[in-house]
Regions:
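Short catalytic micro-motifs in class I SAM-dependent methyltransferases
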Residues: 115-116
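Conserved Class I S-adenosyl-L-methionine
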Residues: 163, 167, 174-235
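Nucleotide donor/acceptor-binding cores
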Residues: 48-50, 106
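Class I SAM-dependent methyltransferase SAM/SAH-binding core
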Residues: 50-54, 58-100
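A conserved beta-strand element that flanks and buttresses the S-adenosyl-L-methionine
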Residues: 112
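A short glycine-rich, Lys/Arg-flanked "PGG" loop and its adjoining helix->strand segment in the class I
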Residues: 124-136
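Conserved class I S-adenosyl-L-methionine
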Residues: 1-47, 60-61, 139-167
Length: 235
């Protein structure tokens, strides 16, 4: 099933548990450039007054942007649960769709869309909306993964192709360039080392489209090292 399937997205983000498991495992095990820190830096470079984060998840980044940059931050997510969690952090968050943003033209200095655009059915419409709400000379920060993200892991489990990515490391520049005159890609590559079968199985079980492979995880004779390929594409 594709990641831009609305029913899949609704199911995946009705609760935070699976997202929290993926994030906690990845953060604990990754070595190399931290894509979350890279995204924060791209926002901070602009010293923005007004920031919008779409696909805000549990609100960690939105809260940090307001706290550390002193920016006025608004957040949007299609999941009621994610908005609830973000509001609990003190962030002004609303339930909404990136394909039809509830904000006026030229409202924000920076818009953040991290690991969300591959969930959108109509990418062209979504990117046009992101461009619409940005002020002149504003910046969009959009993170996604590469087609070979954690390729060694999926090859081990017999599912080598990155499934369902409509917006990825390879086509991101072309898709964003339809609305933005300049798009720069920065890679945040690293290595994720899974120390044992149970850690790996827990991670796989929490993935969106490959959770059915969890029981196929074999015993590991040595830690499994797999590449993490993430692209940040600021305007």
């Amino acid at each position: 099933m594709r990641l831009d399937n609305p029913l899949l997205v609704q199911w995946e983000y009705a609760s935070e548990e699976r997202l929290a498991t993926r994030n906690a495992t990845y953060r604990a095990l990754v070595e190399g450039t931290n894509p979350e820190e890279l995204a924060f830096r791209f926002v901070a470079e602009r010293a923005p007054k007004d920031v919008l984060e779409v696909g805000c998840g549990t609100g960690e980044l939105a809260e940090r942007l307001g706290r550390e940059l002193g920016a006025t931050v608004k957040a949007l997510d299609i999941s009621h649960r994610m908005v609830e969690l973000t509001r609990a952090r003190g962030v002004d968050a609303v339930v909404g769709d990136v394909q039809q943003l509830p904000y006026a033209d030229a409202s924000f200095d920076v818009v953040v869309a991290n690991w969300v655009l591959y969930h959108v059915p109509d990418l062209d419409r979504a990117v046009a909306e992101l461009a619409r709400v940005l002020r002149p000379q504003g910046r969009l920060v959009a993170a996604t993964v590469g087609h070979d993200h954690m390729g060694e892991l999926w090859t081990l489990l017999g599912d080598a192709a990155t499934s369902g990515l409509s917006f990825d490391h390879d086509n991101g520049i072309e898709l964003l360039s339809r609305q933005f005159a300049r798009v720069d890609r920065h890679e945040a590559n690293g290595t994720v080392s899974f120390p044992d079968r149970e850690t790996l199985r827990t991670f796989v079980a929490a993935t969106t489209t490959r959770s059915h492979l969890a029981d196929a995880v074999p015993e590991l004779r040595e830690p499994l090292r797999t590449r993490s390929v993430v692209a940040e594409e600021p305007r």
